[in-house]
Design a protein with these regions (language model features):
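Outer-membrane beta-barrel porins/channels
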Residues: 8-28, 96-431
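N-terminal, post-signal peptide beta-strand-biased segments of exported outer-membrane/organellar beta-barrel
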Residues: 5-121
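Sec-dependent N-terminal signal peptides
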Residues: 1-3
Length: 431
């Protein structure tokens, strides 16, 4: 169910933003893994393909560094009400890091066990806006700083996974993974800092609200996988990840539907209520893929995958821990397909070049469809394999001002431009 949404970061507490557990190798191959025997990440993508390449034990550590940039701009009109340009009034750039890893153990012939710790849902989103006033001509400083608007969301839901694979026939493998989901240090902060009252601010006085959101209990999410290898050249994989319900307590920022855009939005109550609760039902995800070993003089592999999620089954309900009544948000999300493809070409025996791309539909509509490009390589040194991968993409959409000025009624929607890149390094050691 984790999709390569990869953007729309403002909606990070409504949609899972992490594209799932991937090593640098599978990330550089277009976030593949359904039909490719790649190691520990098969615990997540397709447990039927768990393998240690005939080694007894493989241990993998994965580090990532993600850069995110968001620019918001409002349209500038001429006397004929035509848009002359879009004036960028806030630009946020942040770097985030993460660590994941696990191991694959060969129990006996054609039977493998995988253990991993990975990020299931990353809630991180940071927004900082400097608000300036507008004074008449002749004033030395015509645009003094009047205040700041801030949003900070942090924390994640971590997946502790255990998976197994077994060969049932000579060409068919089956696998199962139990993903135990646990929330870790989730925070939600919303602030308006007023240095001096001004109509350009969203409030005439400062206020800050912070809540430490908790995931109610632990949730188990199963993944089922099957693979079929008709010959040495082709391998076909299928995976199914079951839908789950997640309940969050101590919620202050309440999701809602933005009336103008019909996109997700947020309501920030003026009074703190520690009994707020949000329950999100995430739909199941189905994936199918094929890996082909090309008949080239140099070793070459190609992968192609389709992923399907029926986001119309997504549900979000709000309520209180003090009573059983709940209110359901009807977001009217749409089903979405993803296409993942990649090529691994060895120029030298141990040094590959990898390239891939991802096309993702969005449950939010055509405006949010986007393409991501991936690149990578690797080097083998003895029993250790060092992999490097990078993924990058961008997105543009229209939305309201999230901190509207008190004096102005915003008529035109703003343009939000997002760009992101993620660099991953993997080290795998075989015993």
């Amino acid at each position: 169910m984790i999709s390569s949404l990869g953007a729309q970061a403002y909606f990070t507490s409504i949609f899972p933003q992490n594209p799932g557990f991937r090593s640098a190798r599978t990330m550089s191959l277009g976030m593949s893994g359904v039909a490719t025997s790649a190691g520990i990440e098969n615990v997540w993508t397709n447990p039927a393909l768990l393998s240690t390449n005939e080694k007894r034990l493989s241990i993998t550590a994965i580090g990532s560094l993600r850069r995110f940039e968001e620019k918001r701009a409002f349209p500038v009109m001429d006397m004929f009400d035509d848009v002359v340009t879009n004036n960028v009034y806030v630009a946020n750039r942040y770097w985030y890091n993460n660590m994941e890893g696990g191991m694959v153990l060969k129990l006996r012939k054609n039977n493998y066990l995988g253990l991993s710790k990975s990020t299931f849902w990353d809630f991180t989103y940071d927004y900082a806006e400097e608000v300036r006033g507008s004074l008449p001509s002749g004033t030395y400083n015509r645009d003094p700083v009047r205040g700041y608007n801030e949003i900070h969301r942090g924390g994640q839901i971590t997946a502790y996974s255990i998976g197994m694979s077994q060969t049932v026939f000579s060409k068919i493998n089956i696998g199962y993974t139990a993903n135990i989901l646990k929330g870790e240090t989730m925070v939600d902060r919303y602030a308006i800092n007023v240095l001096e009252p001004d109509d350009a601010l969203a409030s005439d006085s400062s206020y800050t609200f912070s809540s430490y959101v908790s995931l109610a209990g632990t949730t188990m999410m199963p993944t089922f996988g099957i693979s079929y290898q008709p010959n040495r050249q082709y391998q076909i994989g299928f995976a199914y990840q079951k839908g789950i319900d997640l309940s969050f307590n101590n919620v202050w920022t309440i999701p809602k539907i933005n009336e103008r855009t019909q996109l997700p939005g947020f309501h920030h109550p003026s009074v703190w209520d520690s009994t707020g609760q949000v329950t999100i039902a995430l739909p199941a995800k189905m994936s199918i893929g094929v890996e082909a070993k090309m008949k080239n003089p140099l070793k070459t592999k190609a992968v192609f995958e389709l992923h399907y999620t029926d986001w119309s089954k997504y549900k979000l309900t709000t309520g209180s821990t003090l009573d059983t009544s709940q209110s359901e948000m009807n977001f009217s999300f749409k089903e979405a397909w993803e296409i993942h493809s990649g090529i691994e070409h060895y120029f030298q025996e141990q040094i590959p070049f990898r390239f891939g791309f991802i096309f993702s539909e969005s449950p939010l509509g055509q405006e949010f469809e986007h393409i991501q490009i991936t690149l990578g390589s690797a080097y083998v040194w003895g029993k250790a394999t060092f992999d490097f991968g990078i993924i990058f993409g961008s997105l543009s959409y229209r939305y309201e001002d999230i901190f509207p000025a008190m004096a102005d009624e915003t008529i035109d929607l703003e343009t939000v431009n997002e760009s992101s890149s993620n660099v991953k390094f993997s080290i795998q050691y075989d015993f």
